[in-house]
Amino acid sequence: METVQCDSALSYVVLSALFSGLVARKLIRNKVKIENVAVSCLLSLLLLEIFCCCVFCSHLGLLLFVAACALYYVSIPVRRMLTAQGKTVLITGCDSGLGHALAKYFDELGVLVYAGVLDKKGQGAEELRRVCSSRLSLIQLDVTNQGQIKTVYDEVKNRVQDAGLWGIVHNAGVLGYMADGELLPISIYKQCMDVNFIGVVQVTKMFMPLLRKAKGRLVTISSMAGHAPIPGFAAYAASKAALTMFSAVMRQDLFKWGVRVSAVHPSGFKTNIFGSRELWSSQYKNILDNIMPDVKEDYGEDYLATLKDLHYTMSTITSSDLSPVLEDVCHALLAREPYFSYTPGQCAYLIPCLFRYFPLWVYDNFAKQTFQTHRNILPRSLRNSKSNNKMD
């Protein structure tokens, strides 16, 4: 009996080793990212192996385990990419940062790029003219300006004609300012919604006839902040949450037309969305000019002054390597079977997972330690209240 059990256990070990090698080879060859679904399946297979080995003493358990492994292996996506040549893609927000990098990246791949910029005479636009090929066309595009959107639509329509537009990458976005939600002026909330959400809707609605004609791709650059609350991101996160849900609904609506929709949720990348010290100072002054006197008194100017430190810290802990985002956007545009959701970057999946599946106190403590470690100061009224309690 012991010999049979040893032979059975050895069979499971051999099969597991063989299966692991085959899976690793297929994952590497097809550049498949190990994300939550893949990890869950692998853990399930491990538990199934233990169960089959312990409960079934016959070949039935072995056959069940082999069948499960085979199903998992077949389910691993094969990286089949479409050719980039001849495809036309519109990218918004190409003046700097991620949009600028995307314009260069897809131009090098041979895509006909329409790079939308706020300033055609700006430094970013000039660099794109200098380093990119004649395939790239610079266009003046403010996503909040309906007139500019219509002008760009007419230009693109005349060029692509019956072929249609293969892809739109909604990259244009603003952060506004990081501060307690009560402190943010309504103007910042409106700016975030206008650019990050309403602008995307306006451009999408205008270009959908061309996108449907090509049975192309709609790609939105959202954010991990659209899935989980982060202290100080009230305006930005609300706009990205709206964008995330818009993308999810459009995926359902456009499926019947053959248009595939993908949402990319980057986390921890260094782009110009954080702004500069001059912008932080301007926004800080805007906050001071707009908050009510009693609110300013409750928070205290020493607390308000730490807000600029928050921007500086966030801009220094991010990664300047944008390649994970570029590769994911490329997959969304050119893969035969694109994913709906991509999560490149540090903690892009971990943070939403903690928020959804763990007790709120676990996530709240994690968020506090991760995003506010340098802010060891309370608002003035809370400090005074604590001092009074200690005296009592």
PLM features: residue spans?
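Canonical Rossmann dinucleotide-binding motif of NAD(H)/NADP(H)-dependent dehydrogenases/reductases
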Residues: 72-114
